Amino acid sequence: MPGRAEAGEAEEEAGAGSGSEAEEDALWERIEGVRHRLARALNPAKLTPYLRQCRVIDEQDEEEVLSTYRFPCRVNRTGRLMDILRCRGKRGYEAFLEALEFYYPEHFTLLTGQEPAQRCSMILDEEGPEGLTQFLMTEVRRLREARKSQLQREQQLQARGRVLEEERAGLEQRLRDQQQAQERCQRLREDWEAGSLELLRLKDENYMIAMRLAQLSEEKNSAVLRSRDLQLAVDQLKLKVSRLEEECALLRRARGPPPGAEEKEKEKEKEKEPDNVDLVSELRAENQRLTASLRELQEGLQQEASRPGAPGSERILLDILEHDWREAQDSRQELCQKLHAVQGELQWAEELRDQYLQEMEDLRLKHRTLQKDCDLYKHRMATVLAQLEEIEKERDQAIQSRDRIQLQYSQSLIEKDQYRKQVRGLEAERDELLTTLTSLEGTKALLEVQLQRAQGGTCLKACASSHSLCSNLSSTWSLSEFPSPLGGPEATGEAAVMGGPEPHNSEEATDSEKEINRLSILPFPPSAGSILRRQREEDPAPPKRSFSSMSDITGSVTLKPWSPGLSSSSSSDSVWPLGKPEGLLARGCGLDFLNRSLAIRVSGRSPPGGPEPQDKGPDGLSFYGDRWSGAVVRRVLSGPGSARMEPREQRVEAAGLEGACLEAEAQQRTLLWNQGSTLPSLMDSKACQSFHEALEAWAKGPGAEPFYIRANLTLPERADPHALCVKAQEILRLVDSAYKRRQEWFCTRVDPLTLRDLDRGTVPNYQRAQQLLEVQEKCLPSSRHRGPRSNLKKRALDQLRLVRPKPVGAPAGDSPDQLLLEPCAEPERSLRPYSLVRPLLVSALRPVVLLPECLAPRLIRNLLDLPSSRLDFQVCPAESLSGEELCPSSAPGAPKAQPATPGLGSRIRAIQESVGKKHCLLELGARGVRELVQNEIYPIVIHVEVTEKNVREVRGLLGRPGWRDSELLRQCRGSEQVLWGLPCSWVQVPAHEWGHAEELAKVVRGRILQEQARLVWVECGSSRGCPSSSEA
């Protein structure tokens, strides 16, 4: 029973607890319903003191609500305060309602529906009356402080208002002054406009007056001319009248005076009086008449006045007369005024007459002056016209002479074309004859060799063979001289080889044949000198091709017999568009040609595991090797098979390379050597083959993507008008890979930023471009300091050494008869004229590599010191991504060790993670850039150009004293040479764009931001995502 009672009490308590929790939830749900209104209206700074006094929040909660940065606006702070109070349960709800009742009664009424009673029950329960008094005192003190601060603020605002009022008054006064000034300016502008209009009007009036004056001058001139004519006519009439009067007088005298003649004469005299005299006389008579009438009237008035009591009629008559007198007086005054005006007009007319007479005299003087000037100009014009006639005659003569010269020039061009056709025909005939002669001499030499081998003796020792080899080789190379332009003794000696008609030349040829073939009767292989002599006899080329026979030993290509198609002018022009480099190439390339690798293996049998012979030379010699190490004499075949020899065109092969690319290359090589070029082979076989495969794949696909290539080097200019002048780092788009069936490509130059086509033209294909670059490299004058003859004699045998190679799996003492003749090794060189590239638009932030490497650390620091640069850039560890340098091989031809790059993947991942945030500044070289591109990370490569002008500013960036300008320039230019081999595009900062270190950092930053928005050109095959077949 007690247990059941306790259980019942626990259930009642649990039910009461659950009921209170539900009630609290309902209350808070009501508050949450208007949470958005409370959060916008309440100020947490007013509520927190009361809530702290009620002990529902503490100092930490108050600081979190009011001072934390998590809640920047008041709405967030109010919401956080409400969340804290909800966690306090019922006490928090009651304290929140009392705070609302105390500070925000309208919101209290909204929540509860009751009017606020201004009670502080929570404080009384927690603190008691003392706590409430303390709270109220605190609130009063806070309100007093608020009021005091408000009063201070009001005083400050009033003072500020007075200051602003004074400023406003000053501004109003200034505005009034400006308005007055503006009004004055407006008035002045109006006056100026009125003055301008008046000036224009006066100018128009002046112009009209001038026009009127000119018109009056013309009228005056015409009037003067008319007056002259009239005066002449008057003079003639006067003369005629005088004659008639004389005749009449004679007749009157003869007849006597007629009646009334005197009266008629008087009338005539009266008629001849001028009108003005009549007018004056009339006026005088009228004046006298009026004066007389006036006197009579005055006398009558006096008489009437003297008589008293005059009647009214007389008075009226007197008034009438007085009125008439006044009118007469007025008319008299008018007549006087009219007379005065007439006199003034007469005086003005006289003045005008004098003025016109003066102007007439002036005009006469000007007329005489102008007449003299006109005569002078007429004389000058006549002289100029005479000179022009002479010049026209000379011009006609020059045109006739030019036409004659042009006709002669056209005739000379026609004759030149005819001569060219004749020269081509003669060259074709000569080629046929030389071909026939070559075949006959080859057959003769073959027969002689077979005859001598049939009479063979015992075998010589290896030392004697090697001695004869070196002696014959040195003698042969010392005799290989270049012909004299004027036909000196060298040309005479060469005629013995070509078979001249002179007797002593034939004797010398016979002796040389005996000397050459005296060792061929033995079974031991012939010496190198014998091979050279035989090749020279079989190829009757000019003396300038004396070194081209060496390519059968040092290169992999066996020379074809000399054919007409290769020596014609058309084929020569196709290979050498700028002309044949005959003497220059022969002299400039001889020394470098002998410095290449030379290996001649003389043995009786093939070493185990060795390569099979690839071609059979004359006298049964078997050649093997590739075009990098040179052809190698392997063995001499014996028996009937050794007598077989084809003097036809021999096949050109290279070890390990097949396809149309290598065949085209071999044809070009043969064509170059037949024309006297002895250039070494610098072609990259792997690049050529891969490029050719990518080109064939593009040509087969009709809807393939554009085939973009980048020019790695500046190609030589060509004479073809349709050829493009290609410079380094230019992007080309291939349009036609077999343009007109020639060794040219039809391409379009592309803008690397917008991919728009700029201009079109032809460029040499891959093999042709390599040959042109080889010629350009070999013809540089800087590497030609000494003559080829002295260098040939000194270095021909110094670079040769006799070694005994060991066959694979054979003991050390085997095969004592095998001798290997090898020179010093030469480093590999490879000319890649083009590279297959593709454009990429990288949206992520790309890392930055700064070159030269010696300037990168200080330049990175300067870049980070710029304002707001650390928001865009960050520094990565200054360790090379390429790991350790490649270890040099211990022996020539040994495989190169692979670089050990521990932790490379982690560094790559670190760079990839930082790419999306900021530009990563790296201190890497060219090899590190290749590693990044292989991992599909495309950096922005910025190279700072260093010249002699800015080397001092660059030296200040190093931070290490003791550097000389020459050393710094050499190191920076060395890093610039490495840029051309990078698999991605790069940008250079010219020296003229910056003057000091800070300006350089700003320029570099601007270039980085520009390059981030541009396309990046990457070589196909340089990254893992691109197929390796397109690697060029």
From Swiss-Prot:
Detected in adult heart, kidney and liver; lower levels in intestine, placenta, muscle and lung. Also found in fetal lung, liver and kidney. One of its GO terms (molecular function) is signaling receptor complex adaptor activity. Residues 1-23, 253-276, 481-553 are annotated as: Disordered. Pfam families: CARD (PF00619). CDD domains: CARD_CARD10_CARMA3. The modification Phosphoserine is found at residue 18. One of its GO terms (biological process) is regulation of immune response. Keywords: Coiled coil, Cytoplasm, Phosphoprotein. Residues 138-456 form a coiled coil. Residues 23-115 form the CARD domain. GO terms for cellular component: CBM complex; cytoplasm; immunological synapse. PANTHER family: CASPASE RECRUITMENT DOMAIN FAMILY (PTHR14559), CASPASE RECRUITMENT DOMAIN-CONTAINING PROTEIN 10 (PTHR14559:SF12). Scaffold protein that plays an important role in mediating the activation of NF-kappa-B via BCL10 or EGFR. This is Caspase recruitment domain-containing protein 10. It comes from Homo sapiens (Human). The gene is CARD10.
